[in-house]
């Protein structure tokens, strides 16, 4: 059941990234995600539910998400992962 839940969360995250993710930038262990107005909390919740390895947590405003990772390499990998979902 856990594997099915994780797959469903990843599928949902992929769909939401395609629809809502406007831009991604990272510095050190932080990743900043931009969304249309009003969508940041929705996308941040999907990221939290996906339980991506290396993500410590998210903070969402109206159109911006601060995603905190465990390190610089993880920030790069997670940025690439989320951008990959938009293609």
Region locations from a protein language model:
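Minor-groove-contacting beta-hairpin "wing" of winged helix-turn-helix DNA-binding domains
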Residues: 1-7
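Non-DNA-binding regulatory cores of transcription-related proteins
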Residues: 8-79, 83-85
